[in-house]
């Protein structure tokens, strides 16, 4: 008799996605981040659900409801810090996943790549709105500064900002709607993840060489289920170490002060995972230009497939491109550092140089390097 997993309409889908899926035999640990992102999403949805049971989205009680969660709810402190630091783990995995895609040429799967970019924007929007919910100083001023950027849009800007705020400033209406959006978006993300996987399974996974691996496939289970489980254990261990030993390491102390519209914090800055984009935004003295650069800092990923000039897919055998890739990584780390610094000399100049280098590397230097490598290999 045929196994039920191969005949049952629902189990059949699971079987083709997670059990009998033909996978390349040589995919490295860099391919673990996809499943880790799935784990992060599940952790965030479950911890978020339990937080939402005790949180109140009202300006007068939001801050104290978070305090109540940490002090009075059973293991509330654990749920809260798992959720806050889970977001950091989410972004670490996201950036590693995108970096892997760039390095090994996974962006040539256009549909999968484009859904991935939409997912990145959706996760960033969710994280931003989540940061506003505790209604601390950095929550309030972060929301004010970032939403205010939309006023740079010609003609409709001011109206748009007031429409998003639900008034003439960030207030009760803003907090309530941000909570509603923050709650619904992860489920939209989960749906997009399924579409992401649907498109991926149309082509099958890429591998480190970038060479088609149809002649050498192995079943996903048990090989990659075991490998992913190891990844899960390592990730959970690292997250628990962070949560249980230094839960506030990545947070901002200003967010332990309740929101006060009359008192601006000396340095308004977002969470660490947005600092690179924030640095790019600040490096342009014009408001609209800054907003465009901010959006383009992520949207530039959509141009990468069309700038792929190399005859090879992966960077595995392309030393010049490899050097440029790691220059890009170093540049992003520099931007992250600059984003957390005050707007003064020499940080302004460093930020501007790093911003120019970021776009130049992706849009000009990498395609040029590919052409040079083709020439060297007489292709």
Curated annotation (Swiss-Prot):
Heme b b566 binds at residues 97, 196. It is a multi-pass membrane protein. InterPro entries: Cyt_b/b6_C (IPR005798), Cyt_b/b6_C_sf (IPR036150), Cyt_b/b6_N (IPR005797), Cytb/b6-like_sf (IPR027387), Cytochrome_b (IPR030689), Cytochrome_b_C_euk/bac (IPR048260), Cytochrome_b_N_euk/bac (IPR048259), Di-haem_cyt_TM (IPR016174). Heme b b562 binds at residues 83, 182. PROSITE patterns: CYTB_CTER, CYTB_NTER. A ubiquinone binds at residue 201. Binds 2 heme b groups non-covalently. One of its GO terms (cellular component) is mitochondrial inner membrane. Its cofactor is heme b. Keywords: Electron transport, Heme, Iron, Membrane, Metal-binding, Mitochondrion, Mitochondrion inner membrane, Respiratory chain, Transmembrane, Transmembrane helix, Transport, Ubiquinone. It is found in: Mitochondrion inner membrane. The chain crosses the membrane at residues 33-53, 77-98, 113-133, 178-198, 226-246, 288-308, 320-340, 347-367. One of its GO terms (molecular function) is ubiquinol-cytochrome-c reductase activity. One of its GO terms (biological process) is mitochondrial electron transport, ubiquinol to cytochrome c. The cytochrome bc1 complex contains 11 subunits: 3 respiratory subunits (MT-CYB, CYC1 and UQCRFS1), 2 core proteins (UQCRC1 and UQCRC2) and 6 low-molecular weight proteins (UQCRH/QCR6, UQCRB/QCR7, UQCRQ/QCR8, UQCR10/QCR9, UQCR11/QCR10 and a cleavage product of UQCRFS1). This cytochrome bc1 complex then forms a dimer. Belongs to the cytochrome b family. PANTHER family: CYTOCHROME B. Heme 1 (or BL or b562) is low-potential and absorbs at about 562 nm, and heme 2 (or BH or b566) is high-potential and absorbs at about 566 nm. Component of the ubiquinol-cytochrome c reductase complex (complex III or cytochrome b-c1 complex) that is part of the mitochondrial respiratory chain. The b-c1 complex mediates electron transfer from ubiquinol to cytochrome c. Contributes to the generation of a proton gradient across the mitochondrial membrane that is then used for ATP synthesis. This is Cytochrome b. The lineage of its organism: Eukaryota, Metazoa, Chordata, Craniata, Vertebrata.
